A protein has these predicted regions:
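Conserved C-terminal helix/tail region of periplasmic/extracytoplasmic solute-binding proteins
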Residues: 2, 24, 30, 49, ...
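Long, aromatic- and glycine/proline-rich binding clefts that accommodate carbohydrate-like moieties
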Residues: 48, 303, 308, 357-409, ...
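Extracytoplasmic "Venus flytrap"/periplasmic binding protein-like
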Residues: 71, 75-142, 149-151, 173, ...
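Extracytoplasmic/periplasmic substrate-recognition and gating elements
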Residues: 74-75, 80-85, 98, 156, ...
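A structural signal for short loop-to-beta-strand junctions that line the ligand-binding cleft
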Residues: 99, 106-109, 137-174, 204, ...
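Hinge/lid segment of periplasmic solute-binding proteins
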Residues: 113-165, 181, 190, 216-221, ...
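Extracytoplasmic/periplasmic solute-binding protein
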Residues: 153, 157-161, 166, 190-239, ...
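Glycine-centered hinge/linker elements that transmit conformational signals in sensory
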Residues: 192-195, 199, 235-267, 310
Length: 438
């Protein structure tokens, strides 16, 4: 059993005289004021941690971001941008974002996304609208296609950062040798390819992405545009895959194989396989993305090629399938204002110039295509602007991923000969219509 003993404390206080009382009173007040100021100034700095803004990104680009992330964090001591490096496969990054959102509380404040993810993510309620944070005048500085690709039901959900667009690469030296101009139409492309092959100047005429993957859908979007067709009308939900223009587009691609213009293996080629064929001097024409330019400029065909918009039918125009990446804000984030601060930083011209000089990516701001620093290093940028200013978007529908899978499967069947173009496109159209009605 515990025992407690009382302790007596006796304090003798003598009454101070009036002079000492005044001195100690003022001294005490001064000390209290000083301590209060120190607490107000120092304690928040000690106890307040920077707000962390998280974003998931492909590992390669995450590494390329490191200088910008360091600069941002130094410039914003109360914020900390944290980059989570994911796989380099963009489909897997999309899956990781999707899984995080489906769990109900995504750890990511920023969403760095491909243009084709916008509709799916916005329709699911996973993104916050950016419309109240940016004016239309500010958006006018960007490529129109990139801005429109970031909208869903009239609201903006994605701020453009860098763009991409499909184009035609061609060998200037080979065309000069036969005294020809670059092709403008599908027929001219076939004729020039055949001439160059007959004169044994090049093994193959034209290479393109025929493998069953997203690149096949992107490539076909451009051919379809060149024939005056369409995939899905996002406003009316009408499907155009079984119309004559779409069937003619498939027949053109089949003809490049059957007539020996393209190699039989083209139906297994993605971007890199086609780039290597062109870069090694084995093809006169190539459909690909801007990244090829820098690589080909450091190869045996350096100075012997140029770019132009894709070929098309005489009565129709060219269209570049628009790709590219931009920023959204997670609807579940508690740090939405801070996430917008990051977007504002990445939108500054000087930040973008620094990044694009280092990486060779293509800016989404139109003025940067003629920026002296960028043009001095990437002389093709003004020509590239002519390409990306005539974009064709993949269908901006929430079910895009499933629609693309349908198209890829049936295109592959038609290109490999297991179905006729009519059979394949009719089946693709029927499945797509059923998908849109779900």
């Amino acid at each position: 059993m515990f025992k407690f003993h009382a302790i007596k404390l006796r304090i003798n206080i003598r009454p101070p005289n009036s002079k000492s009382q005044g001195f100690w009173l003022h001294f005490g007040l001064a000390i209290a004021t000083f301590v209060g100021i120190i607490c107000l100034a120092v304690l928040p700095a000690i106890t307040q941690q920077p707000v962390t803004v998280k974003v998931l990104i492909q590992a390669l680009e995450g590494t390329q971001w490191e200088p910008l992330v360091e600069d941002f964090n130094n410039e914003h001591p109360n914020l900390r941008l944290e980059v989570v490096k994911g796989p380099n496969n963009t489909n897997l990054v999309e899956d990781l974002y999707t899984s995080a959102f489906l769990l109900g509380d995504s750890p990511y404040d920023l969403v760095y996304m491909d243009i084709v993810w916008v509709q799916k993510f916005a329709a699911a309620g996973w993104l916050s609208s950016l419309s109240d944070r940016v004016t239309e005048t500010q958006l006018d500085a960007y490529l129109e296609g990139d801005v429109n690709g970031g909208r869903y039901e009239g609201k903006l959900y994605r701020m453009p950062f860098r763009t991409d667009g499909g184009m035609l690469y061609y060998r200037t030296d080979l065309l000069k040798e036969i005294g020809a101009e670059p092709p403008e139409t599908f027929e001219e492309l076939m004729t020039l390819s055949n001439t160059l092959q007959e004169q044994e100047l090049v093994p193959w005429g034209y290479v393109w992405q025929g493998k069953q993957y997203e690149g096949l859908s992107a490539m076909f979007t451009e051919i379809l545009e060149g024939y005056g067709g369409f995939w899905i009308d996002a406003d009316t939900q009408e499907v155009g895959l079984d119309k004559p223009e779409a069937i003619a587009a498939v027949e053109f691609l089949r003809d490049t194989i059957s007539e020996g213009i393209s190699p039989p293996g083209v139906t297994t080629y993605a971007e890199e396989e086609t780039r290597r064929l062109f870069q090694n001097g084995n093809s006169a024409f190539l459909r690909n993305w801007p990244y090829v330019y820098s690589l080909a400029s450091d190869s045996e065909i350096a100075g012997k090629f140029a770019i132009k918009p894709m070929v098309h039918q005489p009565e129709h125009g060219s269209g570049a399938c628009l790709g590219g990446w931009g920023f959204g804000i997670s609807a579940s984030s508690d740090n939405q204002d801070e996430a917008w601060t990051v977007i504002e930083y990445f939108s500054r011209p000087e930040v973008q110039i620094k990044y694009f000089l280092e990486t060779g990516y293509v800016p989404a701001k139109t003025s940067l295509f003629n920026d002296p620093q960028l043009v001095a290093k990437f002389s093709y940028l003004p020509d590239l602007l002519n390409v990306v200013q005539n974009p064709v978007l993949r269908p901006p529908v929430a079910q895009y991923a499933q629609a693309s899978d349908i198209l890829q499967r049936y295109l592959s069947a038609a290109l490999t000969g297991s179905q006729t173009p009519e059979q394949a496109m009719q089946a693709a159209a029927n499945e797509t219509r059923a998908l849109l009605k779900r």
